[in-house]
Amino acid sequence: MIDYDKLISEKCRVMKPSGIRKFFDIAAQMDNVISLGVGEPDFQTPWNVRQAAITSLEKGKTKYTANSGLAELRKAISENIRKNTGISYCDNDEIIVTVGGSEGIDISIRTLIESGDEVLIVEPCFVCYAPIVSLCGGVPVSVQTTEETQFRLTPEMLREKITDKTKLLILPFPN
């Protein structure tokens, strides 16, 4: 028999399951429920997107890309941002493309956080932020927004939580 307490790291053993999972379990047992959970679309992927994926596969584009993502995609993102906002980012040095948002968040936090660094996390927010901070040795610090502030961060809320150990602010949007 495997002793999971010895196999699994202490950092992972102390992680509590996400509370949203309880809602998923309840919703899965009900009919005609619209989930407002983790942002999964309730529609089928549009045909033009599926067709583009099929075409890419047919052209043999099935290999790993550069760690920072496809060069042509990074360039297109850079051009789109510049066109829509007037802000210029270098597609080679300042833009990366990940397989999903969670991976990008994880990479960013791992890159910036040292053991003991505090990370301010404005809530409500996506459930993975605090566990990733903890796994990186950081200290998640919740900054709760309320209905009274229309779930917006105020300067006072921020000042109240900032310390000498604060290294990062996670500011979810929309919030």
Show the residue positions of the predicted features.
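Short glycine-rich anion-binding loops that position phosphate/pyrophosphate groups of nucleotides
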Residues: 41, 102, 173-175
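Conserved PLP-anchoring active-site segment centered on the Schiff-base-forming lysine
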Residues: 111-133
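A short helix-loop-beta submotif of the ANL/AMP-binding
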Residues: 135-141
